């Protein structure tokens, strides 16, 4: 039976089946019903056509693709066939030219094809089969090794070559060990003995050849050990494989062409004879069927002999294969090649052979050459065409095969060398430029295994049974020969492949190297060449693989010859050594740089074993041997190893060596000089070598260990360079990297081979020497020891540390640079190794620290100082703190380069001693350590982090010395007064350096601030950088910029700290609070939290003392208590947090500490600074900031605040720092990635591992980035984060605190200036909470953050937040996220009065209690607050509360929340109260609806948008939302469940305000949402009424509840109605989405329902003027065609709600209010917040509304909005309407109107219209008017709302809201909105879709035309009807979509489009339309809920029903009907 591929749905089902079934149809006029049915049928048909068109498009597209593919394949096949045809002719000739083809039976064609030149780039051709190409297309790109080129000495491409060069493996594999050489020698001797016996044996065998051939012929294939192919096939197989054949392919081809026929005959005869002879030979000779075959017997000049022998051995050897297969000429050539190859094969073994054999080999070669000449002569004579002779000759040759085999070893080598030299010389010359590298690579690629086999076969020649031997030779000898060639070529690659090619050939060299007969006279050259070939190959290969073999071999070679040293380096010299040699020993660099280099190595020869090992082990050999041997030797060894490494790296070494080594190398010629010379020359000049060695010991050894320099380079690069040695750098380097920094040792450990060697060498020597001497200090302390040895005072040490710390920071700066550079390296190199990168980065830092220490200690120290200094200077420029410290560090370095260098180096190494080093180290490394030694940092985390800082004893000292030097000084100093200022401010100071003396800063703070900041900064920087590196490294140091932006370390540190600093105050306060609780509960409350804030305010400096002492106690006490932990946690928080998560406070800190994480150290450093900064920020903020929201803005921006802080006193400087933090925070906030990035670096990059950091990270991210990003995380992060905020606020709120605290917060907020006592109250509460909940830190952190952002807000606010937080923390440890969100909110709300943040917090707290996730919402509200910074504090609280509730309701809302945040951003200007209202509303809502969150989020968004609107509006909104949430907890849940996308809708609403509209509702939902938004925008009154009412209640806490309840009831009714209606879920979802909007919706129900009727009850109530709103018909025929109307009609949009406007607005509000109410309040709020233009007025209105709600205003606003909606619709129905609509309506709407409207709206279709409005609003947010989507994207949705009697459908092009500020050209839903066709004129019928289609409205003028003419659309009966309909359906026109004015349907849109006059006329039709609508909805039962709302609720209900139907239809019909319904509802 046929399969149905596509089925078209019934047009009736596609139309509006409910129209036919609707019970309301009975109530409709028959004409209307018929019109509706007609339209429905038409729509169904259109939809069918659309479906068919879509299907056909798919079919044709598929056909086109197939045709294209087929054609492409045909072309490829054709091209392939052509190429094949062109290639076949020579093959055919070759095959046909042979007289006998029997060998084909034994030889695969692929085996003899090798004689044919191989093509290249076979897989690059475009005509390959798809099956082949697919495998390549699926391949990944090669690693971006080229990124490392700049760090490599070799220049561009060197790294890629280095790590992709197959010769490395070939050499490595081909390099036999000394034992192999010995074997080879024995084998040669054995063969010599055999050769003497062979002639006789061969003679004897010759007689039996034919018999044995026949007998054994069958065994030919098996005699080669498991090879099924005959020896011929083997030989042929080998031939193709030999690169020589490829190289010689030209010659071979020529010779082949020349002697093809003769050779074929001969070869045929020979093949037979060979076959027989070989069989006989094998059997008779070995008895086991194997023969020692002759690779090539005759010299190059005797091809005949070769052919004979080749054939004889041909069955046995590849040469013979070729010979047998190929004609004479070819055979000769091939034989020559083979001879060459065998000689090479022998060559390789010879190369393996020690120089001892060279003489023997030379002698034997001479003898063999003589012998070869003889046999070749014999063969030549026998080679004649006579087959019998040839057979006999072959027999004899075969007999002589063994002799020849030996001879071949000698002569063959010689010949092959000469031939190879000639051939290679020729080929090399020919292909030198091109093929050389390629052939080498290819040869290497193909020869690698062969090389190994060759070596084995060579070594096994006598040891292995000859069948196996022959197998190898037959198969391998050629390859070996090839490999020998390749090796020689490759070996000489170092020599240079060119040399082989150019040297006619190192025939001697090859002979020598191959034969192992390095002529004494040639020893220098040949040895160098041969050794390099062998050794270098070995050396190069053995570097890693066979260190000892190579080593033993190399030693013997080296021992045998000094030249081998040269040889050894030859390879290096090629890359590194020239530099090496160049610097070190210009001795023989010349052409034989290798040799010269080798001499350098020769100088290093003592280390030559080491060198090989080093090559092998790189550093370990260096380390082992260097330790074993002289340091110079070692350095030399290492130096060679570098050279080797360099050869390996070839880039790095040269570069590194040049840079690092050059200095060293200049004296490098002298082992000691080379080694010490660099450090000594560099350092010893300053410091005695002993000191240098002792102090810098690791440095001199380390540094002077030029390998270190290389290591540096290699380590720096080794991480890279060595890391470049991918094998190791990943494994070793990463740990090394991290550990290197952590400990030079770890790096060394991690890079045991290389880094470890280098570093370890450094380390080892230092460890052994220094480390053992001072193992603790000496590890890094080796540096430390150097430092200690330097005996710099701790101050100096500190300063040195600073130098060190700075050096580390510098390193990190260098790191940054380096990381910048190195990260590239690291990143470039170890992108693979992300963590390694980080470690690498870290390592680089370390590497730089270490390597730099080493390098820097010698040269780089200066260099590094240069780096450090420059970076310091630069960094100093970047980081004043660091700059200071850096300067100091620089100065320290400057203090004494010796000291600085030695010390700094020492210090850097001493840094480990410095604990700062550890801190830096750990700080730097911490992230690293933490990252790298997660094990450590987790266990030691506090220890390592802080301990790292304090690790050296700092922790034990409680970081007294290091940390205390950091911490202790902070404790002692900082803890006292300065300590806090110095310590925490030490960052502040460090940042500003103003408050604490640079000395203190430098010494104390510097260690602390710098050490910590830098350390931490290093860490953050490092982590930031490193995270940037680690995280950012992959990120390419995105964050470093961020870090840099923040002051990098400050950024990360500060940002967290900022969050934490304040939070530290909060957190620290809470932390400190615990201490401070201990210190003083009251002070804890006031001084502690307030201390941080209020006291910081009042006691700013005093309380800083106290705060410092206390806060230090807190920060430090806690940090020290847990400060160490906290700090630790702070420092370690990432660590400590994880580690200290155990600890409540640390967890708090963790939470806080998360911020503290970086902030903790910073906190420790910064806690003071925050006290300073925070106090400065806080104090100033309270003084200034609270007073100056601007500062808050600045604060919020933190850039600004930093700027403002700049305005702020020196504390400001910390403030600046703090602002940097804050700035970072704003980054964090503003940049989610920055939050995520900054914190994430720490968190994610650094402590993602840490649960809490993740949590903060997630939360933090989720707050900022995660929220938007983690729309997944939002729940997680948001929930967590929310839980933070949620818990905290919840506790506040839920503890009556919400009301009391919230008001308190609000009061506090509003009472920003409230005295500290109030703050203490808050603080006390906070203290209590803190007491109650150590975790509260999270909340505190939020509070802190909030405080931070709200710093300007009085401390009490922060306290409130804290208090709130406390409970929250109590409830939810993770709440800090929420709090953090809240913080962010506060941050953004910083400008908002302090109370706002608390309110938000309180609300959040409440919510958080209920919903942990809420924090996301909070975060959003935070963000919202952030964006809504301008909004009064209450607003933020409102937002927070709302968000809290919302979050509570919807964890996932975070997206929405995030959106709301963004919205809030847009709505920053909105008064705080508004946010508060939103918040309040949200709380209930959240309680009620977890999912409501979206709505809440929307409401937050709305609140955000509404924030701009007067605060009262928002509160009303919020309250309403709360009520709504309360009313429909399940709905939100079902809605959310039902509408994850509905949240999307909400999200869209948010997104609308925010670009983040990632969730798209179905067309219906989207349209409804957009329409709701649009309507809402158009009828701001509703938001205003609702908003003011809510806001007013918000201001009056009870009121929101009342309002909330009322809206809730309305919503219930509305939703009930709507919900009951078919589209209930969607509607509810819409409502839920609307959430807060629903109350609006309730008001708007009228718009959504029956515009006038609904408006009549509600609006009439709401609109005292009783002005009726005319429906606006919007024509967008052009829109349908994708044309944008040229000009929107101009509507007056009074910003202030004048009475007239108010009346108008009231009228419009009736519609728009209903719509808006129908649309989510969030939309409304969003609109408000999105009404920045009108915001001032709306805000005033809001405020006035708050104080007094005037329906007039709301009406006026609605009317204005309505006008705006008309404008917007006219303007483009998307951008314009959105932008126009979003403001005005909300501000003006009064609460009363709003309430009534809300009821109606809610009853009607709050969800739909709110959704629509939101979408509309979204559009308006983004706003530029945009034309309707192109026709191809247009979807004509028709969902008759309640079977409206209107026969006309208006094509409604919903405004495409610009998602994310972009016009998302999704498939806009075009809805044919049925409009009641009550009109009598026939235009309705004539105006059917057809008329509209031509883009002509029933007015005959397109909208654009009308707009151009500035005419308002003509009113037509249909338009009036539409207006009525619109009144009934809701103000469709307000929908921000373009409506295609299909005259039949014009009523709906035309109402929107109509001028106000028409709007006024609307009421005439409205009642009838309403009635029609009432009758219309078939889902009357669902409108029963609407009936619940019956007042005019019936109308509303019907409207709602319509919407519901639409919604339901949307659900049923894919959202199309919903859109219509929505549009109707909204339009109505």
Swiss-Prot record:
Gene Ontology CC terms: cytoskeleton
**Listed Polar residues bias regions:** 203-219, 258-276, 1513-1524, 1644-1663, 1710-1723, 1737-1754, 1981-2004
Residues covered by region (Disordered): 171-244, 258-283, 366-390, 416-443, 877-903, 1469-1491, 1511-1536, 1639-1663, 1710-1754, 1911-1931, 1977-2028
Query: What are the Low complexity biased-composition ranges?
Result: 1473-1483
Per the record, where are the segments of Basic and acidic residues compositional bias?
A: 171-188, 366-382, 1922-1931
Q: Which InterPro entries does the record cross-reference, listed alphabetically?
A: SCAR/WAVE_fam
Bilayer-spanning residue ranges: none
Quaternary structure and partners: Interacts with ABI1 and ABI2.
Protein family membership: Belongs to the SCAR/WAVE family.
Q: What is this protein called?
A: Scar-like domain-containing protein WAVE 5
The protein's organism comes out as: Arabidopsis thaliana
The gene behind this protein is WAVE5
């Amino acid at each position: 039976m046929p399969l149905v591929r596509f089925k078209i749905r019934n047009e009736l089902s596609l139309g509006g089946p409910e129209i036919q079934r609707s019970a309301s149809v009975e109530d409709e006029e028959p004409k209307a019903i018929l019109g509706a049915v007609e339209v429905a049928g038409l729509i169904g048909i259109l939809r069918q056509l659309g479906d068919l068109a879509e299907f056909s498009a798919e079919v044709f597209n598929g056909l086109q693709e197939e045709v294209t593919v087929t054609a492409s394949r045909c072309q490829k096949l054709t091209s392939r066939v052509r190429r094949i045809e062109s290639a076949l002719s020579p093959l055919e000739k070759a095959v046909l030219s042979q007289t006998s083809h029997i060998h084909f039976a034994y030889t695969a064609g692929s085996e003899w094809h090798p004689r044919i030149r191989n093509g290249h780039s076979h897989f690059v051709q475009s005509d390959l089969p798809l099956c082949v190409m697919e495998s390549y297309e699926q391949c990944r790109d090669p690693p971006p090794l080229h990124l490392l080129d700049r760090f490599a000495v070799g220049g561009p491409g060197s790294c890629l070559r280095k790590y992709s060069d197959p010769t490395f493996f070939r050499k490595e594999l081909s390099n036999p060990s000394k034992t192999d050489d010995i074997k080879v020698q024995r084998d040669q001797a054995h063969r010599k003995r055999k050769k003497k016996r062979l002639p006789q044996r061969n003679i004897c065998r010759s007689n039996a050849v034919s018999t044995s051939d026949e007998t054994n012929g069958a065994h030919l294939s098996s005699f080669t050990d498991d090879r099924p192919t005959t020896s011929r096939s083997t030989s042929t197989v080998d031939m193709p494989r030999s690169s020589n054949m490829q190289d010689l392919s030209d010659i071979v081809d020529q010779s082949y062409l020349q002697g093809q026929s003769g050779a074929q005959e001969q070869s045929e005869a020979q093949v037979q004879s060979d076959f027989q002879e070989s069989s006989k030979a094998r059997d008779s000779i070995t008895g086991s069927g194997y023969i020692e075959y002759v690779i090539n017997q005759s010299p190059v000049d005797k091809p005949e002999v070769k052919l004979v022998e080749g054939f004889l051995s041909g069955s046995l050897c590849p040469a013979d294969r070729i010979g047998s297969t190929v004609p004479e000429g070819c055979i000769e050539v091939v034989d020559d090649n083979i001879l060459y190859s065998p000689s090479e094969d022998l060559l390789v073994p010879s190369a393996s052979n020690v120089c001892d054999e060279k003489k023997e080999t030379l002698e034997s070669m001479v003898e063999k050459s003589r012998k070869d000449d003889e046999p070749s002569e014999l063969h030549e004579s026998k080679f004649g065409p006579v087959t019998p002779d040839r057979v006999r000759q072959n027999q004899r040759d075969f007999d002589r095969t063994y002799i020849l085999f030996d001879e071949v070893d000698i002569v063959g080598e010689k010949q092959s060398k000469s031939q190879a030299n000639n051939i290679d010389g020729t080929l090399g010359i020919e292909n030198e430029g091109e093929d050389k590298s390629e052939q080498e690579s290819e040869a290497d690629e193909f020869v690698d295994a062969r090389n190994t086999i060759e070596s084995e076969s060579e070594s096994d020649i006598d040891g292995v049974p000859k069948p196996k031997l022959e197998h190898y030779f037959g198969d391998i000898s050629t390859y070996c020969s090839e490999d020998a060639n390749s090796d020689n070529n490759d070996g000489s690659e170092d020599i240079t492949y060119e040399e082989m090619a150019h040297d006619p050939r190192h025939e001697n060299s090859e002979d020598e190297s191959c034969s192992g007969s390095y002529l004494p006279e040639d020893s220098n050259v040949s040895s160098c060449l041969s050794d390099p070939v062998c050794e270098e190959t070995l050396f190069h290969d053995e570097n890693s693989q066979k260190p000892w073999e190579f080593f033993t071999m190399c030693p013997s070679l080296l021992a045998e010859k000094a030249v081998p040293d040269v040889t050894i380096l030859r390879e290096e010299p090629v890359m590194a050594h020239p530099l090496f040699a160049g610097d070190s020993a210009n001795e023989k660099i010349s052409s034989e740089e290798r040799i010269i280099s080798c001499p350098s190595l020769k100088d290093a020869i003592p280390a030559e074993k080491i060198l090989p090992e080093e090559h092998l082990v790189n550093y370990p050999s260096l380390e082992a041997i260097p330790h074993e041997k002289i340091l110079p030797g070692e350095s030399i060894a290492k130096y060679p190893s570098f050279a080797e490494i360099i050869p390996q790296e070839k880039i790095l070494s040269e570069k590194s060596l040049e840079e690092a080594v050059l200095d060293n190398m200049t004296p490098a010629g002298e082992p000691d000089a080379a080694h010490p010379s660099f450090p000594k020359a560099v350092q010893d000049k300053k410091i005695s070598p002993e000191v240098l060695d002792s102090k810098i010991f690791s440095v001199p050894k380390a540094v002077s260990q030029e390998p270190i320099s290389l290591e540096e380079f290699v380590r720096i690069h080794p991480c890279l360079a060595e890391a470049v040695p991918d094998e190791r750098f990943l494994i070793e380097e990463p740990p090394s990297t991290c550990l290197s920094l952590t400990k030079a040792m770890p790096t060394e450990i991690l890079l045991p081979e290389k880094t470890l060697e280098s570093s370890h060498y450094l380390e080892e020597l230092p460890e052994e020497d220094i480390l053992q001497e001072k193992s603790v200090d000496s590890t890094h302390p080796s540096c430390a020891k150097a430092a200690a040895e330097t005996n710099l005072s701790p101050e100096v040490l500190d300063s040195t540390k600073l130098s060190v710390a700075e050096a580390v920071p510098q390193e990190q700066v260098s790191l940054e640079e380096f990381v910048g550079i190195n990260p590239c390296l690291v990143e470039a190199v170890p992108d693979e190794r992300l963590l390694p990168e980080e470690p690498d980065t870290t390592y680089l830092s370390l590497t730089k620290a270490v390597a730099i220490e080493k390098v820097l200690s010698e040269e780089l120290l200066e260099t590094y100082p240069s780096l450090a200094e420059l970076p310091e200077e630069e960094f100093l420029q970047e980081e004043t703190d660091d700059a200071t410290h850096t300067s100091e560090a620089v100065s320290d370095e400057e203090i004494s380069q010796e000291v600085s260098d030695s010390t700094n180096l020492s210090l850097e190494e001493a840094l480990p001693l410095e604990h700062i080093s550890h801190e830096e180290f750990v700080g730097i490394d911490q992230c690293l350590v933490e990252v790298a030694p997660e094990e450590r940092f987790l266990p030691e985390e506090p220890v390592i982090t802080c301990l790292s800082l304090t690790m050296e004893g700092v922790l034990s000292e409680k970081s007294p010395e290091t940390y205390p030097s950091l911490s202790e000084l902070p404790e002692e100093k900082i803890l006292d007064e300065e300590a806090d200022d110095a310590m925490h401010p030490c960052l502040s100071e460090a940042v500003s350096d103003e408050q604490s003396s640079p000395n203190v800063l430098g010494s104390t703070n510097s260690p602390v601030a710098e050490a910590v900041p830098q350390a931490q900064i290093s860490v953050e920087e490092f982590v930031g950088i490193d995270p940037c590196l680690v995280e950012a490294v992959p990120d390419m140091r995105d964050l470093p910029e961020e870090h840099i932006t923040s002051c990098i370390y400050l950024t990360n540190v500060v940002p967290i700290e900022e969050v934490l600093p304040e939070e530290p105050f909060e957190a620290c306060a809470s932390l400190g609070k615990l201490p401070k609780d201990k210190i003083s509960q009251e002070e804890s409350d006031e001084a502690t939290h307030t201390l941080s804030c209020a006291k910081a305010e009042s006691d700013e400096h005093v309380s800083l003392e106290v705060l410092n002492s206390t806060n230090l106690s807190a920060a430090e006490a806690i940090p020290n208590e847990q400060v160490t932990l906290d700090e630790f946690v702070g420092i370690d928080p990432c660590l400590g947090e994880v580690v200290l998560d155990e600890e409540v406070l640390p967890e708090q800190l963790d939470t806080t500490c998360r911020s503290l994480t970086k902030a903790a150290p910073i906190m420790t450093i910064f806690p003071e600074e925050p006290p300073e900064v925070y106090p400065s920020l806080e104090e100033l903020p309270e003084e200034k900031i609270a007073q100056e929201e601007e500062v808050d803005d600045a604060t919020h921006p933190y850039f600004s605040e930093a700027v403002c802080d700049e305005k702020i006193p020196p504390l400001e400087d910390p403030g600046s720092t703090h602002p940097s933090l804050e700035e970072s925070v704003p980054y964090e906030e503003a940049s989610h990635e920055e939050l995520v990035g900054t914190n994430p670096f720490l968190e994610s990059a650094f402590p993602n591992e840490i649960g809490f950091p993740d949590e903060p990270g997630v939360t933090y991210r989720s707050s900022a980035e995660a929220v938007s990003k983690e729309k997944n995380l939002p729940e997680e992060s948001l929930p967590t984060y929310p839980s933070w905020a949620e818990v905290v606020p919840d506790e506040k709120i839920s503890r009556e605190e919400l009301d009391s605290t919230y008001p308190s917060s609000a009061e506090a907020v509003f009472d920003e200036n409230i005295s500290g006592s109030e703050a203490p109250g808050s603080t006390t509460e906070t203290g209590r909470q803190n007491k109650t909940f150590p975790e509260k830190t999270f909340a505190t952190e939020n509070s802190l953050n909030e405080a931070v952002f709200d710093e300007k807000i009085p401390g009490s606010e922060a306290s409130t937040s804290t208090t709130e937080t406390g409970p929250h923390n109590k409830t939810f440890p993770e709440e800090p996220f929420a709090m953090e969100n809240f913080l962010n909110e506060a941050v953004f709300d910083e400008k908002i009065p302090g109370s706002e943040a608390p309110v938000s917090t309180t609300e959040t707290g409440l919510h958080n209690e209920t919903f942990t996730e809420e924090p996301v919402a909070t975060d959003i509200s935070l963000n919202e607050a952030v964006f809504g910074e301008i909004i009064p504090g209450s607003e933020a609280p409102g937002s927070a509360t709302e968000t809290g509730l919302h979050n509570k309701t919807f964890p996932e809302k975070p997206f929405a929340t995030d959106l709301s945040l963004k919205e809030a951003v847009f709505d920053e200007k909105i008064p705080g109260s508004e946010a508060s209202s939103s918040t309040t509303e949200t709380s209930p809502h959240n309680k009620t609806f977890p999912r409501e969150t979206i709505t809440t989020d929307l409401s937050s968004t709305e609140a955000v948008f509404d924030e701009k609107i007067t605060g009262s509006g928002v509160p009303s909104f919020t309250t309403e939302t709360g009520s709504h949430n309360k009313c429909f907890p399940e709905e939100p849940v079902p809605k959310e469940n039902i509408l994850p996308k509905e949240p999307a809708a909400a999200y869209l609403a948010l997104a609308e305000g925010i670009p983040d509209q990632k969730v798209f509702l179905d067309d219906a939902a989207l349209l409804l949402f957009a329409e709701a938004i649009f309507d809402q925008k158009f009828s701001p009154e509703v938001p205003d009424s609702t908003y003011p009412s809510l806001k007013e209640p918000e201001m009056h806490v009870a009121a929101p509840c009342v309002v909330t309840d009322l809206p809730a009831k309305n919503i219930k009714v509305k939703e009930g109605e709507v919900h009951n209606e078919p589209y209930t879920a969607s509607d509810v979802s819409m409502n839920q989405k609307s959430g807060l909007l629903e109350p609006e919706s309730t008001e708007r129900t009228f718009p959504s329902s029956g515009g006038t009727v609904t408006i009549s009850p509600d609006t009439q109530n709401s609109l005292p003027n009783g002005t009726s709103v005319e429906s606006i018909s919007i024509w967008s025929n052009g829109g349908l065609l994708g044309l944008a109307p040229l000009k929107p009609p101009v509507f007056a949009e009074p910003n202030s709600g004048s009475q007239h406007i108010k009346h108008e607005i009231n009228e419009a509000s009736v519609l728009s209010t209903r719509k808006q109410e129908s649309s989510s309040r969030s939309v409304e709020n969003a609109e408000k917040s999105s009404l920045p233009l009108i915001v001032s007025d709306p805000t005033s209105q809001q405020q006035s509304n708050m104080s007094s709600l005037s329906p007039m205003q709301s009406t006026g606003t609605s009317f204005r909005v309505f006008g705006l909606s008309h404008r917007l619709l006219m303007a483009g129905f998307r951008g314009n309407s959105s932008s126009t609509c979003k403001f005005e309506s909300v501000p003006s709407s009064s609460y009363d109107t709003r309430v009534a409207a809300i009821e109606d709206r809610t009853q009607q279709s709050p969800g739909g219209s709110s959704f629509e409005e939101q979408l509309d609003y979204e559009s308006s947010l983004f706003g530029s008017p945009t034309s309707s989507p192109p026709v191809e994207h247009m979807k004509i949705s028709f969902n008759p709302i309640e079977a409206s009697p209107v026969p006309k459908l208006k094509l409604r092009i919903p405004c495409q809201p610009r998602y994310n500020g972009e016009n998302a050209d999704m498939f806009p839903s075009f809805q044919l909105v049925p409009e009641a066709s009550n009109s009598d004129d026939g235009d309705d019928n004539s105006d059917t879709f057809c008329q509209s289609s031509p883009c002509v409205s029933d007015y005959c003028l397109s909208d654009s035309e009308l707009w151009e003419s500035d005419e308002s659309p003509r009113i037509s009966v249909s338009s009036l009807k539409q207006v009525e309909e619109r009144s009934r359906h809701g103000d469709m026109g307000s929908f921000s979509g373009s409506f295609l004015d299909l005259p039949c349907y014009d009523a709906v849109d035309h109402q929107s489009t109509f001028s106000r006059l028409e709007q006024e006329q609307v009421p005439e039709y409205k009642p009838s339309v309403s009635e029609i609508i009432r009758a219309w909805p078939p889902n009357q039962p669902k409108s029963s809920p609407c009936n619940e709302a019956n007042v005019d609720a019936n109308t509303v209900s019907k409207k709602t029903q319509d919407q519901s139907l639409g919604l339901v239809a949307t659900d049923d019909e894919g959202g199309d009907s919903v859109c219509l319904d929505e549009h109707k509802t909204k339009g109505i």
